[in-house]
């Protein structure tokens, strides 16, 4: 190529529209304006509820449950005396959730109004425990945004097949939030609302357990930072999420409609992510979004395409311990990404040379690669475009774990079996969508709908993966895997409307005609009776839950509520 031709090409490239190279699509102004208006209106509504509830917030603060939206250190938020529930572990272990508050029963699948999940989350201020007496799909038209702190959402209480939140995002913009056995599958492909299934602006004391998060258009589930506006004319402050745990949870099959089939962005201060499954996400499995100690233990990562675990910055500390990596059909097995355990980033350093954070990586299995499995630093930890950490190894490699919350640790092989047997929203039951994901991880064979070769699904014009990638697990539209299943269930009888079925109350010596017994404690162990019901805790025997040796998942062991 001569110099004149090169200059012509360079000129064309310089003045070409940015959309030619854009990773993301252009959003029509009218659609963006409509989406922004929708979010603004929802925020104004929630703000009005919070303003009306100032007296309630002040009263809770007097009784040891203050509202602290500016929390930025683990010590900024008070900690409960006993775990959020038996089996809660990690950084979020001592979140209060809704303990001691009112019991709200979801009885409607509608987007908003009396008896809805939105009303329980957005329309109520004060500590609350949310239970379900309805089964089915909750189809949202706008995101649910939780601002009022101290809430427990107990998806395991739904009858029959349980519930699934669909259509829009579920945002946590507060602290002291406990969520168990919920399904968040957004499933929409609107260009103006490319957002997570489950995320938000989480402040801290977050405990997520046994949830299923799928079909997000940005990511499936992300918890790592929150933006705090001090309302004094300054710009928003970016603060870490503090005291956060995500355990026993699925992040799978993010939508690749716009090259963004991403699993999660995670992090914060005093954070723990253990016994989870990332499957069929092109990237961010997960990505690390903060520079605190990142504790990633006993997880399973399957069928990534261009990114496994990566992120952080030059000040980050990583505990990558006993995880199981299983390349899938879309993982480039002959490239460095095919056996990548971790790729730390050096971002935000203003030094004139590259600096990376410190890494403790040990006990991780890379299926199909004995060398990396034997020594995780033999190509498993990579920086820049290198096949390993190269000359940075000595400064990065740490031989002992960084300080982390105490919880039991399995081997990587044990964690593979445990995760596949236990992960996700499996009470009242594991649904067919989760079953298919688990089966693919086990066998390598993806489920997809036959006869779609001639169907035109929208795909971003610059999409990286092949059009038929859905046949190998990474999808652009939920119709490629059959969409939402049907959820059925018969409501239980709850005469006094206290969230506990009459049958359970009678079997456990409580009065089905006395709503006040829900917030009492029949054994004096610290868990209220409604907590005993939703977590399958004994009503006959007092257990010292302050003793960590007694901390086991009572609900998982029983496998059901009644």
What are these regions (language model features)?
Residues 22-60:
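Intrinsically disordered, low-structural-confidence terminal and linker regions
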Residues 150, 155, 159, 175-186, ...:
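Right-handed parallel beta-helix
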Residues 84-130:
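Acidic Gly/Asp/Thr-rich repetitive segments characteristic of extracellular carbohydrate-active
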Residues 494-498, 502, 525, 529:
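Acidic carboxylate motifs that coordinate Ca2+ or other divalent cations, activating on Asp/Glu
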Residues 118-126, 138-152, 163-180, 186-203:
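Extracellular beta-strand-rich solenoid/capping regions of secreted or surface-exposed proteins
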Residues 295-307, 317-327, 331-393:
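Predominantly extracellular beta-rich ligand-binding scaffolds that present long acidic/polar faces
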Residues 24-35, 53, 361-362, 368-495, ...:
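C-terminal functional modules
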Residues 1-24:
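Bacterial Sec-dependent N-terminal signal peptides
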């Amino acid at each position: 190529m001569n110099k004149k031709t090169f200059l012509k090409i360079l000129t064309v490239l310089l003045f070409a529209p940015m959309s030619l190279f854009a990773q993301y699509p252009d959003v029509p102004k009218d659609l963006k304006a409509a989406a922004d208006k929708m979010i603004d209106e929802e925020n104004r509504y929630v703000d009005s509820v919070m303003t009306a509830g100032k007296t309630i917030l002040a009263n809770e603060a007097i009784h040891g449950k203050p509202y602290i939206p500016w929390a930025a250190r683990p010590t900024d938020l008070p900690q409960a005396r006993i775990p959020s529930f038996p089996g809660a572990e990690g950084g979020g272990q001592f979140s209060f959730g809704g303990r001691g508050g009112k019991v709200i029963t979801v009885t409607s699948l509608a987007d908003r109004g009396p008896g809805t999940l939105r009303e329980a989350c957005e329309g109520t201020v004060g500590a609350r425990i949310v239970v379900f007496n309805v089964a089915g799909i909750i189809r949202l038209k706008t995101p649910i945004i939780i601002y009022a702190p101290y809430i427990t959402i107990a998806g395991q209480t739904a009858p029959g097949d349980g519930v699934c939140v669909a259509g829009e995002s579920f945002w946590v913009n507060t602290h002291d939030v406990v969520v168990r056995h919920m399904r968040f599958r957004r499933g929409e492909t609107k260009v103006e609302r490319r957002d997570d299934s489950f995320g938000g602006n989480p402040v801290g004391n977050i405990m997520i357990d046994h949830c299923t998060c799928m079909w997000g258009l940005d990511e499936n589930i992300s918890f790592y930072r929150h933006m705090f506006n001090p309302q004094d004319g300054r710009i928003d402050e970016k603060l870490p999420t503090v005291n956060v745990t995500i355990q026993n949870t699925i992040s799978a099959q993010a939508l690749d409609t716009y090259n963004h089939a991403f699993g999660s962005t995670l992090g914060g201060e005093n954070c723990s992510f253990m016994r989870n499954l990332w499957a069929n996400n092109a990237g961010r499995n997960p990505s690390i979004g903060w520079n605190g100690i990142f504790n990633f233990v006993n997880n399973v990562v399957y069928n990534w395409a261009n990114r496994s675990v990566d992120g952080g910055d030059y000040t980050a500390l990583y505990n990558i311990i006993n995880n199981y990596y299983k390349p899938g059909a879309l993982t480039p097995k002959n490239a460095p990404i095919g056996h990548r355990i971790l790729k730390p980033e050096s971002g935000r350093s203003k030094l004139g040379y590259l600096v990376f954070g410190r890494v403790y990586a040990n006990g991780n299995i890379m299926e199909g690669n004995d060398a990396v499995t034997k020594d995780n630093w033999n190509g498993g930890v990579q920086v820049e475009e290198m096949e390993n950490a190269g000359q940075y190894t000595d400064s990065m490699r740490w031989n002992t774990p960084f300080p982390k919350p105490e919880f039991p640790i399995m081997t990587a092989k044990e964690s593979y079996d445990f995760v596949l047997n236990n992960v996700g929203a499996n009470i009242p039951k594991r649904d067919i969508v989760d079953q298919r994901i688990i089966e693919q991880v086990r066998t390598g064979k993806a489920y997809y709908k036959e006869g779609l070769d001639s169907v035109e699904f929208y795909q971003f014009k610059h999409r990286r993966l092949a059009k038929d990638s859905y046949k190998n697990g990474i999808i652009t539209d939920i119709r490629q895997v059959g969409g939402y299943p049907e959820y059925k269930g018969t409501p239980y009888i709850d005469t006094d409307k206290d969230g506990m079925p009459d049958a359970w109350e009678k079997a456990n010596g409580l009065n089905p005609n006395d709503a006040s017994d829900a917030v009492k404690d029949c054994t004096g162990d610290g868990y209220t009776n409604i907590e005993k019901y939703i977590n399958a805790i004994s009503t006959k025997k007092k257990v010292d839950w302050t003793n960590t040796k007694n901390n086991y998942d009572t609900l998982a062991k029983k496998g059901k509520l009644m």
